[in-house]
């Protein structure tokens, strides 16, 4: 009997991680994406405005998300990572580290997908003809 393992069905949710350079949102929904379970941001976890987008704030938010998911009965997550996109940056900000915290906190990870909006033909980017001068 000790060699037998029971299969435990994983209850999946979807974690939408929006990592911009100003803040990080971790938004958990059901599989269809219609029903929101919970939303947490980096700004809810730290006091200083400059720390909202930091990896530390994102990891605190993700740990809290994992704990609340377990209370709701969600044991596994598919993850959608999103950057600002459009005619702005297509690389996720430092808050994408929240993914690592979700994995460490005991949540099973299903699929990881990049859902950054990428334009097929975009409007002109701000900054002028000669670009932003520092």
From Swiss-Prot:
GO terms for cellular component: ribonucleoprotein complex; ribosome. It holds the Pfam family Ribosomal_S11. One of its GO terms (molecular function) is structural constituent of ribosome. Residues 115-134 are annotated as: Disordered. It comes from Syntrichia ruralis. This is Small ribosomal subunit protein uS11. Belongs to the universal ribosomal protein uS11 family. One of its GO terms (biological process) is translation.
């Amino acid at each position: 009997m000790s060699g037998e393992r029971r299969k435990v069905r994983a209850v999946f949710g979807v974690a939408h991680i929006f990592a911009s350079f100003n803040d990080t949102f971790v938004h958990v929904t059901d599989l269809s994406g219609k029903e929101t379970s919970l939303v947490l941001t980096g700004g809810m976890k730290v006091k200083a405005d400059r720390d909202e987008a930091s990896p530390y704030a994102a990891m605190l938010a993700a740990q809290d998300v994992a704990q609340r998911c377990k209370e709701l009965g969600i044991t596994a997550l598919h993850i959608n990572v999103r950057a600002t996109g459009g005619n702005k940056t297509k690389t996720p900000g430092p808050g994408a580290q929240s993914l690592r915290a979700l994995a460490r906190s005991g949540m099973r990870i299903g699929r990881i997908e990049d859902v950054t909006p990428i334009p097929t033909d975009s409007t002109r980017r701000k900054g002028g003809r000669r670009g932003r001068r520092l």
